[in-house]
């Protein structure tokens, strides 16, 4: 589904990623851990197409709908239409834009790209409410501006609601556990787990092992100084929790 080959990237002329190689297949959950400044969020933002980061070498191939494309050739909105989703560490507030209207516009944009009919407001309302139940979200969210005056937990749940509504092929969750109490983390993790199937894949970016108690990864990768230095199963996260990163 996603193949990252020899990816090098910089910001403001400073090298951040120094040769990332990673393959993620449908049905898999991968987690990337690493100390602060190792390049974890940089990798997430490059996959999403953030303009502040410059790729100096490498490719990111993405298989979808029987075609293989280098997403580095696509604008951020084109990547989203092709089924790539990113949940931000710090979700953006959009004053004046109703959450349900925002989600319906995004959903119908993907429908249009796929050649499907757009969903009318009444049908979309039913669809949206069914997804909200996955995250124990109150109907009051529907009429609130996107992320405005939301608590940290509400913002993260709203990000996963977007993931549920848009049904992406490949999702990147950038430190989704950041700022969450244990109850909110369980709700968010439960929503992510319910969305997992054999046709999609997820990349978790996290600093701590605790999220991986609730979303079990198939593989854990340790990123340090811009390179993946070790890959194993979930037990690697437990070792990092116990020993830190210096032993690697």
Question: What is each residue range found by the language model?
Answer:
Residues 24-26:
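Conserved hydrophobic segment flanking the Walker A/P-loop of ABC-type ATPase nucleotide-binding domains
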Residues 2-4, 17-19:
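Conserved structural motif at the start of ABC-family nucleotide-binding domains
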Residues 33-35:
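The feature captures the beta-strand-to-loop junction immediately N-terminal to the Walker
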Residues 48:
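Helix-to-loop junction immediately C-terminal to a conserved catalytic motif
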Residues 77, 82, 89-169:
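ABC-family P-loop ATPase nucleotide-binding domains
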Residues 219, 223, 227-248:
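Conserved beta-strand-loop-alpha-helix hinge in the C-terminal portion
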Residues 172-176, 183:
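Walker B catalytic motif
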Residues 59-79, 147:
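ABC ATPase NBD Q-loop/coupling interface
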């Amino acid at each position: 589904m996603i193949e990252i080959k020899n990816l090098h990237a910089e910001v403001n002329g400073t090298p951040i990623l120094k040769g990332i190689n990673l393959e993620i297949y449908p049905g898999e959950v991968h987690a990337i851990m690493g100390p602060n400044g190792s390049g974890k969020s940089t990798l997430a933002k490059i996959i999403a197409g953030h303009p502040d980061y410059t790729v100096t070498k490498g490719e990111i191939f993405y298989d979808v709908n029987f075609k293989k494309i280098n997403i580095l050739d696509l604008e951020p909105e084109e990547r989203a239409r092709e089924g790539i989703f990113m949940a931000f560490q710090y979700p953006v507030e959009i004053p004046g834009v109703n959450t349900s209207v925002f989600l319906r516009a995004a959903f119908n944009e993907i429908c249009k790209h796929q050649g499907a009919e757009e969903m009318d407001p009444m049908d979309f309302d039913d669809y949206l409410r069914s997804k909200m139940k996955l995250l124990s979200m109150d109907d009051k969210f529907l009429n609130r501006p996107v992320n405005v005056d939301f608590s940290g937990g509400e913002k993260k749940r709203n990000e996963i609601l977007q993931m549920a509504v848009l049904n992406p092929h490949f999702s990147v969750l950038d430190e989704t556990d950041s700022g969450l109490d244990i109850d909110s983390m369980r709700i968010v993790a439960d929503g992510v787990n319910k969305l997992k199937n054999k046709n999609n894949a997820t990349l978790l970016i996290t600093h701590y092992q605790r999220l991986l108690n609730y979303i079990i990864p198939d593989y854990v990768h340790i990123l340090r100084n811009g390179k993946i230095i070790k890959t194993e199963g979930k037990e690697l996260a437990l070792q990092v929790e116990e020993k830190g990163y210096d032993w690697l």
